[in-house]
């Protein structure tokens, strides 16, 4: 685990974005941890979040031309990541996002920001079922662009309805790499460093045994 990944886990814990306990997910699964990126909701949170996304992006080495943030959650993430890349990595890259409702006046269409062209890096909070990615792919392909990769905050590394995870399905279906700031494996490594969190570690490991990929 890299220093920025450990810092991200501590940041998420401090904001209660990441919580350990017993939670029922939308799928009905009982999970020993919960991650709600919507709680990164202040200016300082967003500034820090962008730096973590930018760090993971640079660390991945994937080449791309534009950041795309799917509406709605992806919009502030794409924006703050673009700012962080410019301020901390000297990479001044265009960004774009879609609006769910097409406008009938002013600037046309349902895209805001730079023209959607070239190799696209899609940024979002998490991938649960991959629906937002599929909708985004239609927009990307309709504009003649290609998907270079997908960047999210957390990869839960767990099976969906079948034998593979929603993330593995996206990688298979679109022949792209999905990268994340942290994974379930990183969470476990972090818990292993914290003796006071031993009960959570046991629960998360048991969960991985049952649902992990």
UniProtKB/Swiss-Prot annotation:
Binding positions for 5-phospho-alpha-D-ribose 1-diphosphate? Answer: 26, 72-73, 99-100, 103, 105, 124-132
Question: Pathway listed for it?
Answer: Pyrimidine metabolism; UMP biosynthesis via de novo pathway; UMP from orotate: step 1/2
Reaction equation(s) it catalyzes? orotidine 5'-phosphate + diphosphate = orotate + 5-phospho-alpha-D-ribose 1-diphosphate
Q: For binding orotate, which residues are annotated in this chain's numbering?
A: 34-35, 128, 156
Q: Name one GO molecular function term.
A: magnesium ion binding
* GO terms of biological process kind: 'de novo' pyrimidine nucleobase biosynthetic process; 'de novo' UMP biosynthetic process; pyrimidine ribonucleoside biosynthetic process
The cofactor named in the record is:
Mg(2+)
- Keyword field: Glycosyltransferase, Magnesium, Pyrimidine biosynthesis, Transferase
Q: Which GO terms describe its cellular component?
A: cytoplasm
> Is the keyword Glycosyltransferase assigned to this protein?
yes
Give the record's family classification.
Belongs to the purine/pyrimidine phosphoribosyltransferase family. PyrE subfamily.
Q: How does it assemble?
A: Homodimer.
- Biological role stated in the UniProt entry: Catalyzes the transfer of a ribosyl phosphate group from 5-phosphoribose 1-diphosphate to orotate, leading to the formation of orotidine monophosphate (OMP).
Looking up HAMAP family in the UniProt record yields: PyrE (MF_01208)
Q: What protein name does the entry list?
A: Orotate phosphoribosyltransferase
Organism for this UniProt entry: Escherichia coli O45:K1 (strain S88 / ExPEC)
